[in-house]
UniProtKB/Swiss-Prot annotation:
A motif (Nuclear localization signal) lies at residues 487-503. It is linked to Regulation of OGT activity and altered O-GlcNAcylations are implicated in diabetes and Alzheimer disease. O-GlcNAcylation of AKT1 affects insulin signaling and, possibly diabetes. Reduced O-GlcNAcylations and resulting increased phosphorylations of MAPT/TAU are observed in Alzheimer disease (AD) brain cerebrum. Intellectual developmental disorder, X-linked 106: A form of intellectual disability, a disorder characterized by significantly below average general intellectual functioning associated with impairments in adaptive behavior and manifested during the developmental period. Intellectual deficiency is the only primary symptom of non-syndromic X-linked forms, while syndromic forms present with associated physical, neurological and/or psychiatric manifestations. This is UDP-N-acetylglucosamine--peptide N-acetylglucosaminyltransferase 110 kDa subunit. A motif (DFP motif) lies at residues 464-466. It comes from the Eukaryota. Pfam families: Glyco_transf_41, TPR_1, TPR_11, TPR_12, TPR_8. UDP binds at Q849, K852, A906, P907, K908, H911, V912, R913, R914, H930, T931, T932, D935. Glycans are attached at S3, S4, S399. Its EC number is 2.4.1.255. InterPro entries: OGT, OGT/SEC/SPY_C, TPR-like_helical_dom_sf, TPR_rpt. Keywords: Acetylation, Apoptosis, Biological rhythms, Cell membrane, Cell projection, Chromatin regulator, Cytoplasm, Disease variant, Glycoprotein, Glycosyltransferase, Host-virus interaction, Intellectual disability, Lipid-binding, Membrane, Mitochondrion, Nucleus, Phosphoprotein, Repeat, TPR repeat, Transferase, Ubl conjugation, Ubl conjugation pathway. Subject to product inhibition by UDP.
Length: 1046
């Protein structure tokens, strides 16, 4: 405000009076500068009475009245000054100040510009003009005003600092920095410039330089409140919490009632985990500033962290009453609603937060997470991308987007997201865990283990990472601290179930750990409830179901739902069943959850089912369920359970009146929306029915089935070469199979038919015997040619016009057949030498994935090998990284390395065929060989098993019971070892058992797909009749046996 009194020289009074006037004027000016406006006005009025036309006095009076907010009086005296001197720039500037204060910015600017035209070197005029231009939004004009002032006086460091502030606000940080540096060069002790420079460095991410400059500012001015606040803020962001606390406390010593500083200090306490202290400090901030929505929001965060969720919710609501557009409170309240299961309200609040603040990255990410949970993956992806666009270093958004892409089967996209999240935040435990899951699913187990371990180092209390690491270690048979690991895993599950959280152990893995039946069922139940949560948001009314078969012309409509209609073990087992249903009584629908993989398995099911619907083209669960209901399905069969590719949400919507679990998943669904589990008395004894959420529906023999007779008909017969010619015939050293085997054998001279004693299908191998004919080719030139082909690694030779193929080098002709699935068209030779198996040893085998082996199983196997000296164990590199671990543990148990032989995983046909070379299969009690059990039995190899308490541990016993080989089922560990040892040491007994298995696989119901289908139909009809009579689902444990002739 211009307040010059320098016009006294114009006075015509005598010198004495002039001196008196001059002294009074200087006194008034000093009082004005000191802020004693009352005294300054009193003395100025004396001066004005002496010289009413003195423009200096008029200017000072104008300034005094302006400072006292008496704007009209200020304007009056400025106007009087202008009347006295129309060229008085300071008067126009003072009048401009009045207009600016009244909000009349254009009038203010015009007066400032007029002042500067009158006096181009008027520094205060430029400064006042700059302030008015800023208020009017003309930032560039304000910059030019400051620049003009500095052209007249480059040493005005305060002005240069103000120019820097303006440039900083415009985002021109380098220019702002230059201004502050010049101000400091001019006045090195100018604390404000040091603080402002610290703000620029902070904005540029130069945290340490920012800290240095704020500290310099408070050193220069120990009472510089704003600098202490800025220092505290940057230290807080840098997570240097102790020093941040010290800075905020110093600020509070200067201004004890500064609510914002109390709020910021509380934030630091919160980050330090001092929740109670944070709560008290937030409450103090609110006490000082009751209408402080930020403080209420942050207080709510702390209360929520403490577990006071209801009080936190109240605080968020208070913040929103104070400020209905408080985006953080909307977002955080949505988080609470989400955790309470009120998903719709959560979505509404997230959307409201984004309506208020469209660039709110966290709200985009949170909304995306809920949308993902609802199955709205494309919309979720859009919001994650928005979050990342807004905040390119938002590691959580990258990690969560990776989860969505993973669910959409975009593995590479997910991998890139997790990798980027870790690049942004190397200490982001969740991202390391998610990356590990990608490696795990891709079979890169060592990388998965490393990433899970990194996650646990960063976040030791991380149940998901711990349980997934435990599963990875199980896959590769790393049993370091095995017992301790199992105890901790059980403890984690117990704690999660108690707190009603989703357990970190997946239902499909629960069979591998020493969990109680109640825990396993509860784990499945939680996952079933997740499906219900997803479908509840669809608000679909319940479907109305038919009570009779009128609309289907008296036929029962059965729908099989699976993601495995293709080259998958489930299709290998059941591919013929859809086409074997009685078309007069059943109408079969197959609902595929996965795209066509182009294999014959898919083609067969598509061709033989009455209807084949690809639901992978209908990603919306509601619409997919509508399609099933529109088809009028009576019994909907769940073949996935909780395996990869499942869509249990379809079943949660209940599009069919009866819903049953079958074949593809070895356990209970735990879900209220599944009525039955199709099983059998051996697999699921009635006395353990409480292990299942479903009602038990028994098949008369076994619930398991294999389509091996259709897929591998060339293995129905075999011939062997008597390579030793010592009178002892081995049926599994050099084996020939083929569709044209009989014709080939008829072309050979000297083929002997050896009658092998074969027990009938009784309870043991000593029951009445029948003879089994086995063709034996003696050692002659033909046999030698076959052996030479194998030894030289030839692919094929021709004998008597028949092509003879090396079993290790089979080729396929049909491109639509999955690799290794085609039935060989030649005579195929399989030998122990091809796999490095000793010719003169007893070969025990197990072709399961290695995760099914546990320390106690390997110990049993080691005991067996020790008791059968001339024996080896044949395992698969499934995966290869498990081989050295198994070998090391076996050596620790006293077994030389050469007693265990590993082979690579083979294509399906070779895998089944080479099973003929083993003498005995040793099943894994923890989780049996299910499909692999069927494979080895079709090869004619006996399987020793010991049923446990879970469904997964009793399947092999069910298969053997159906086969009529009860003597291979052990009641305990000792009996398991004894049975295996007897088979390995009593060669006559081994022959009898092998002969029995070879015979029974054809004559028993185990591989009789047609009979199985008829029995399954009888069970379906029983379910329907029970439902049609108005009954709720109930156990069906008295199956009706059906013969194929029926």
């Amino acid at each position: 405000m211009a307040s010059s009194v320098g016009n006294v020289a114009d006075s015509t009074e005598p010198t004495k009076r002039m001196l008196s006037f001059q002294g009074l004027a200087e006194l008034a000016h000093r009082e004005y500068q000191a802020g004693d406006f009352e005294a300054a006005e009193r003395h100025c009025m004396q001066l004005w009475r002496q010289e009413p036309d003195n423009t200096g006095v008029l200017l000072l009076l104008s300034s005094i009245h302006f400072q006292c907010r008496r704007l009209d009086r200020s304007a009056h005296f400025s106007t009087l000054a202008i009347k006295q001197n129309p060229l008085l720039a300071e008067a126009y500037s003072n009048l401009g100040n009045v207009y600016k204060e009244r909000g009349q910015l254009q009038e203010a600017i015009e007066h400032y510009r007029h002042a500067l035209r009158l006096k181009p070197d008027f520094i205060d005029g430029y400064i006042n003009l700059a302030a008015a231009l800023v208020a009017a939004g003309d930032m560039e004009g304000a910059v030019q005003a400051y620049v003009s002032a500095l052209q007249y006086n480059p040493d005005l460091y305060c002005v240069r600092s103000d120019l820097g502030n303006l440039l900083k606000a415009l985002g021109r940080l380098e220019e702002a920095k230059a201004c502050y540096l010049k101000a400091i060069e001019t006045q090195p002790n100018f604390a404000v410039a040091w603080s402002n420079l610290g703000c620029v460095f902070n904005a540029q991410g130069e945290i340490w330089l920012a800290i240095h400059h704020f500290e310099k500012a408070v050193t220069l001015d120990p009472n510089f409140l704003d600098a202490y606040i800025n220092l505290g803020n940057v230290l807080k962001e840098a997570r240097i919490f102790d020093r941040a606390v010290a800075a905020y406390l110093r600020a509070l010593s200067l201004s004890p009632n500064h609510a914002v500083v109390h709020g910021n200090l509380a934030c630091v306490y919160y980050e330090q985990g001092l929740i109670d202290l944070a709560i008290d400090t937030y409450r103090r901030a609110i006490e000082l500033q009751p209408h402080f929505p930020d403080a209420y929001c942050n207080l709510a965060n702390a209360l929520k962290e403490k577990g006071s969720v209801a009080e936190a919710e109240d605080c968020y609501n208070t913040a929103l009453r104070l400020c209905p557009t408080h985006a953080d409170s909307l977002n955080n309240l949505a988080n609470i609603k989400r955790e309470q299961g009120n998903i719709e309200e959560a979505v509404r609040l997230y959307r409201k937060a984004l309506e208020v603040f469209p660039e709110f990255a966290a709200a985009h990410s949170n909304l995306a997470s809920v949308l993902q949970q609802q199955g709205k993956l494309q919309e979720a992806l859009m919001h994650y991308k928005e979050a990342i666009r807004i905040s390119p270093t938002f590691a959580d958004a990258y990690s969560n987007m990776g989860n969505t892409l993973k669910e959409m089967q975009d593995v590479q996209g997910a991998l890139q997201c997790y990798t980027r999240a870790i690049q942004i935040n190397p200490a982001f435990a969740d991202a390391h865990s998610n990356l590990a899951s990608i490696h795990k699913d891709s079979g890169n187990i060592p990388e998965a283990i490393a990433s899970y371990r990194t996650a646990l180092k960063l976040k030791p209390d991380f149940p998901d990472a711990y349980c997934n690491l435990a599963h990875c270690l199980q896959i590769v048979c790393d049993w370091t601290d095995y017992d301790e690991r199992m105890k901790k895993l059980v403890s984690i599950v117990a704690d999660q179930l108690e707190k009603n959280r989703l357990p970190s152990v997946h239902p499909h893995h629960s069979m591998l750990y020493p969990l109680s039946h109640g825990f396993r069922k509860a784990i499945a139940e939680r996952h079933g409830n997740l499906c219900l949560d997803k479908i509840n948001v669809l608000h679909k009314p319940p479907y109305e179901h038919p009570k009779d078969l009128k609309l289907s012309d008296g036929r029962l409509r059965v729908g099989y739902v699976s993601s495995d209609f293709g080259n998958h073990p489930t299709s290998h087992l059941m591919q013929s069943i859809p086409g074997m249903h009685n078309p007069d009584k059943f109408e079969v629908f197959c609902y595929a959850l996965s795209p066509d993989d182009g294999t014959n398995f898919r083609v067969k099911v598509m061709a033989e089912a009455n209807h084949f619907i690809d639901l992978s083209q209908i990603p919306c669960n509601g619409k997919a369920a509508d399609r099933i209901h529109q088809d009028g399905i009576h019994i909907l069969v769940n073949m996935n359970g909780y395996t990869k590719g499942a869509r249990n949400e379809l079943f949660a919507l209940r599009p069919a009146p009866i819903q049953a679990m079958w074949l593809g998943y070895p356990g209970t669904s735990g879900a209220l929306f599944m009525d039955y589990i199709i099983t059998d008395q051996e697999t699921s004894p009635a006395e353990v029915a409480e292990q299942y959420s479903e009602k038990l529906a028994y098949m008369p023999h076994t619930f398991f089935i294999g389509d091996h007779a259709n897929m591998f008909p060339h293995l129905k017969k075999k011939a062997v070469i008597d390579f030793k010619s010592n009178g002892h015939i081995y049926d599994n050293r050099i084996v020939l199979n083929g569709i044209d085997l009989k014709a080939f054998l008829d072309s050979l001279p000297d083929v002997k038919i050896v009658k092998m004693k074969c027990p009938d299908g009784g309870d043991n191998a000593d029951s009445s015997n029948t003879a089994l004919n086995m063709p034996v080719i003696p050692m002659n030139t033909i046999a030698e040619a076959v052996i030479e082909m194998i030894n030289r690694g030839q692919i094929q030779i021709t004998i008597n016009g028949f092509s003879i193929s090396n079993g290790l080098a089979t080729t396929q002709i049909n491109n639509k057949a999955a690799t290794g699935e085609e039935v060989p068209r030649t005579i195929i030779v399989t030998t122990r030498s091809q796999y490095g198996l000793p010719e003169d040893a007893i070969v025990y085998c197990n072709f399961n994935q290695l995760y099914k082996i546990d320390p106690s199983t390997l110990q049993m196997w080691a005991n067996i090998l020790k008791r059968v000296p001339n024996s080896v164990l044949w395992l698969l590199r499934f995966p290869a990284v498990g081989e050295p671990n198994i070998q090391q543990y076996a050596q620790n148990m006293g077994l030389p390395q050469n007693r265990i032989i590993f082979s690579p995983v083979a294509p399906k046909e070779e895998h089944v065929r080479r099973g003929q070379l083993a003498d005995v299969c040793l099943d894994t009690p923890l989780c049996n060989g299910h499909t692999t059990g069927m494979d080895v039995l079709w090869a004619g190899t006996p399987m020793v098993t010991m049923p446990g308490e879970t469904l997964a541990s009793r399947v092999a016993a069910s298969q053997l019971t159906c086969l009529g080989c009860l003597e291979l089922i052990a009641k305990n560990r000792q009996e398991y070892e004894d049975i295996a040892v007897k088979l390995g040491t009593d060669l006559e007994y081994l022959k009898k058992v092998r002969g029995k298995v070879w015979k029974q696989r054809i004559s028993s119901p185990l591989f009789n797909t047609k009979q199985y289908t008829m029995e399954l139909e009888r069970l379906y009809l029983q379910m329907w009749e029970h439902y049609a009579a108005g009954n709720k689902p109930d156990h069906m444990i008295k199956p009706v046996e059906v013969t194929e002739s029926a």
